[in-house]
């Protein structure tokens, strides 16, 4: 194994040398022969969890001896630990909820937004006057019907396409007539495996034509700087762009100091949204990760992200029992407030739905250019805000 250690992530290599665990959940990158590799994994009596053919990856739970054996195969290029990503928005109690409002004729009608999050609760604002949850897939607990045991995904869905029916339009989404395809890849604690997220991304891209998905909203952060993992995300982002999609991510929740931005937020083929506090006089949100990163403006722009009001979820509700669909209980309080850069990512996702409704032929570069030229700089350093905040009057027809 020592002669082949260049195929191993250094952290995994250390764990193996130290005999830390009996099993390891890993991502295996193959340059070819993925099916034969999976057959070999099965013959070693190990479990295969995911196969993401778009990026030639397999996720499996392997023993140390199985890892040793697999390293001998020339088609296997690299093996790394399957780490976690984290949602970056927190529920807070506040009497000063900020709502996202747009007063334009565009509503995102017919435009699909793919979301990888903690799920979506069947909230009235997403079901009335029509059901905006076009598809729900659960990669955590494998349930068949919408639910959200964390609340984050429901909140983001409301920011994008909530109808506002429970608040007489006060807390409607930015693109209220758009629809969502929600994949639950994050558990009730707001953690999700990288492999599940990659598989979710591939699923949304592959089914984008069926649901007219134009935007993929990824309201989470990856805190590591693993070049291999980032290369997998970058390949999938490129695939999304080739199909006319745009990927939106938050800048993350590190302190708003120079060079604090990490993970997928640094990639050039996605739109990265930071956050600012708009509750009083504008100021940068304390936990909005900042650039610069290489020669890029990251984040690309910022959006309000403090005390934002949107949909609440009954996190105790489970949508099925023994294969039978269960219906959600009545909830008295329909809305709550969150703070975090994921709110900004959801807002920009909704704005992009409006842009696609107006012109279905836009590509990633078009969207990024439109957002950039329609933004105003605030009185912050550029590494905190990129191009600044969106001026909707300049952006929307």
What are the functions of these language-model segments?
Residues 12-30:
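Short glycine-/aliphatic-rich beta-strand segments at the starts of folded cytosolic domains
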Residues 1-13, 35-98, 102, 386:
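Autoinhibitory propeptides
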Residues 161-162, 202-203, 349-357:
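Short glycine/serine- and small hydrophobic-enriched flexible loop segments
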Residues 143-154, 336-346:
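Gly/Ser-rich catalytic serine loop of serine hydrolases
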Residues 186-269, 337-339, 343-345, 384:
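Substrate-binding/access-modulating region of protease and related hydrolase catalytic domains
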Residues 265-353:
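Extracellular S/T/G-rich loop segment that most often corresponds to the catalytic His/Ser-adjacent loop
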Residues 213-217, 357-397:
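C-terminal subdomain of the subtilisin-like protease fold in secreted/lumenal serine endopeptidases
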Residues 103-113, 119-134, 144-194, 214, ...:
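Subtilisin-like serine protease catalytic core
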